[in-house]
Regions:
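Flexible loop/hinge segments that line or gate small-molecule binding clefts
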Residues: 46-84, 88, 102, 196-208, ...
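Short beta-strand elements at the ligand-binding edges of bilobed clamshell
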Residues: 16-18, 70-94, 105-109, 137, ...
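Early extracytoplasmic/lumenal segment of secretory-pathway proteins
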Residues: 11-34
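Short, solvent-exposed amphipathic alpha-helices that sit
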Residues: 1-8, 85-89, 113-133, 146, ...
Length: 264
């Protein structure tokens, strides 16, 4: 976001805030309204942000959400195809293990609509193409530490797991570490989401598990900044811009492996 603001330095003045919780973001939104912001690009990932975002919109500020769906009238949004990530991950799992087996799905309730949509795409697709698949859900978080801790417990509770539907590469890295630590060989597929060079390297080097990532470009936030500027210029802008996903696995990972890559 800051890179795009710098690129538009002749057109915009900007402030950049990072938030650790809903209360902090609410205070920052108030600060921006006092400052005189005409547009705000926000990532309101916590519950309870509907009213503060609506207040900003009602005061005449253009608000563009990065990825998160919230119940606010007049908000714009640039998003990855979160539901499509779930759809493509479900298809990948079925392609590798068939239409029966046990799949552990790892939703992340704290991520709001991101997790909800990725899970919806996955569960709807599994019901359609593999209705006999046994899907077990365990909540986790988008960190490798949580992936390791939670999946260590999951492995202890489940003697047979055929595939793992993980929503994020960071979680998947922790899951893979838990599998290695436990010496398990039953798991044949692990998905991920986002895309990063460390995970791409694991995809290439791990030949015992089919590992994939549904790409989710961080450059979308730059497009959110561009959308905000376009709205302020009075240009016609669709309220929602969805960026499609791509599956990366062993068959095409070489196209994405690049130590100098600044996107993934």
């Amino acid at each position: 976001a800051e890179q795009e603001c710098l690129a538009l330095a002749d057109e915009v003045d900007y402030k950049l805030y990072t938030s650790n919780n809903a209360e902090e973001m609410t205070t920052q939104l108030d600060d921006l309204m006092t400052w005189g912001a005409q547009a705000i690009v926000a990532f309101p990932q916590w519950e309870g942000m509907e009213v503060p975002i609506q207040n900003a919109i009602d005061s005449g500020i253009t608000v563009v959400n990065f990825d998160i769906v919230i119940d606010a009238d007049g908000v714009y949004r640039v998003t990855g195809d979160n539901e499509g990530m779930g759809v493509e991950s479900a298809k990948y799992i079925v392609d590798k293990i068939g239409t029966t087996g046990t799949v552990v799905a790892l939703p992340v309730p704290t991520s709001g609509s991101v997790s909800e949509l990725r899970m919806k795409g996955f569960t709807d697709t599994i019901k359609e193409i593999a209705p006999e698949m046994n899907v077990i859900e365990y909540a986790t978080a988008f960190t490798r530490e949580d992936g390791l801790k939670d999946f260590t417990d999951i492995l202890a509770a489940n003697k047979q797991i055929d595939a793992v539907y993980s929503l994020d590469d960071e979680t998947s890295i922790g899951v893979l570490q838990a599998i290695e630590d436990a010496g398990r060989t039953d798991i044949k597929v692990i998905t991920g989401g986002g895309g990063c060079q460390e995970y791409f390297k694991i995809i290439k080097e791990n030949e015992s598990i089919n590992i994939c990532s549904a790409l989710y470009s961080p450059l979308m936030v730059r497009q959110a900044v561009d959308m905000a500027v376009s709205v302020l210029k009075g240009e016609k802008v669709d309220p929602v811009l969805v960026i499609p996903t791509t599956i990366v696995d062993r068959s095409n990972v070489d196209e994405y492996l690049d130590p100098n890559n600044t996107v993934y």
